[in-house]
A protein has these predicted regions:
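Carbohydrate-interacting/catalytic domains
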Residues: 1-85
Length: 85
């Protein structure tokens, strides 16, 4: 699908970052991404820049991308999303 995600772990294991990049012109209104922990993920930045009011998404026990947990959110065409957890 030409959508890539990766995690940047902090040395303290707090404030880790999850990046999701959509390299296609297709909007994904309910894109599901696999995540390493069943936690809340806060969307802090997207293709428009830093968010004044970050949105929070709760991971659920639903396998995706070879990960035990995942959550769904809207991903813009050629969009970028950065989450902290």
């Amino acid at each position: 699908r030409s959508i890539f995600s990766f995690v940047r772990k902090s040395p303290t294991k707090r404030n880790n970052l999850l990046f999701v990049v959509n390299y296609t012109p297709v909007e994904r209104s309910d894109y599901r991404v696999g995540v390493p922990k069943k936690k809340q993920y806060k969307l802090i930045m997207d293709e428009n820049g830093l968010l004044e009011k970050p949105q929070t998404f709760k991971a659920e026990s639903k396998e995706c991308d070879n990960r035990e947990f995942s959550f769904a959110y809207p991903l813009a065409p050629y969009g970028v999303a950065v989450f902290t957890y």
